[in-house]
Amino acid sequence: MDKVKIALQYIMPKHLLSRLVGKLAAAEMGSVTTAAINWFIKQYKIDMSEAAEPEATAYSCFNDFFTRALKPGIRPLCDDNDYIVHPVDGAVSQLGPIKEGRIFQAKGHDYSSLALLGDQADDAKRFEGGDFATIYLAPKDYHRIHMPIKGTLSKMTYVPGELFSVNPLTAENVPGLFARNERVVAIFETEIGPMAMVLVGATIVASIETVWAGTVTPPTGKKVFTWDYPTEGPNALTLEKGAEMGRFKLGSTVVMLFAKDALDEFADGVEPRSVTRMGQAFAKIED
């Protein structure tokens, strides 16, 4: 059955399906929307007591529900300045060193950091010998993405690509998955050096948003788009540790890259398949 599921992903019209789902998710259909949200809550066992708006009737469309805010204080931020924090609610897929420009995906699969970053050679060079962490957001999870550490935005890259599912089954069976799917790469300058936040699209994930650009929707095609941002002066965008930096419509994956010698060690309990909660300690900063 697993082989059938993977085979179907290669032949199904993933972009068309995602566009259709995106239109439905943005549609305001009153009681139909409310009924669908209630079904989703029950199907995925979502704890709505954590949501700022716990009632399904509070959401005019599915997208509002998918990107729902949490109650203030429900995710306390680790205040130890020696640690960066989890950027999302989800589960660790993989993490570890970037070895010879390669990032581990799953048993028998890896991919290049250069490909992940949209073949931006200068960017990839900044993360040689560094560390990575890949976190999967399931449909049930909180879908907003936050800053692991204070950082100033220096560059954004949009990389067109496939829209394979990014669940654990697909990660174990589709070579180079995260470097094949559509993605948005945001690079920040931080006190520990450059940090890349790679927001990876997936099947029926209708769009990726950032707080500075809104929904990232370059023209359809195979061209990579880049935007450079000032890191000093009145137009520089600096986001504090724990601040929202983006969001997914439904769920997907975040890949983080850090420079060599930026991180000392991952926090206790942070390992593949471990559950992540935004704001908790993720990794200790190198002294």
Curated annotation (Swiss-Prot):
Pfam families: PS_Dcarbxylase. Keywords: Cell membrane, Decarboxylase, Lipid biosynthesis, Lipid metabolism, Lyase, Membrane, Phospholipid biosynthesis, Phospholipid metabolism, Pyruvate, Zymogen. The keyword Cell membrane applies. Its cofactor is pyruvate. It is a peripheral membrane protein. It comes from the Bacteria. Belongs to the phosphatidylserine decarboxylase family. PSD-B subfamily. Prokaryotic type I sub-subfamily. PANTHER family: PHOSPHATIDYLSERINE DECARBOXYLASE (PTHR10067), PHOSPHATIDYLSERINE DECARBOXYLASE PROENZYME, MITOCHONDRIAL (PTHR10067:SF6). This is Phosphatidylserine decarboxylase proenzyme.
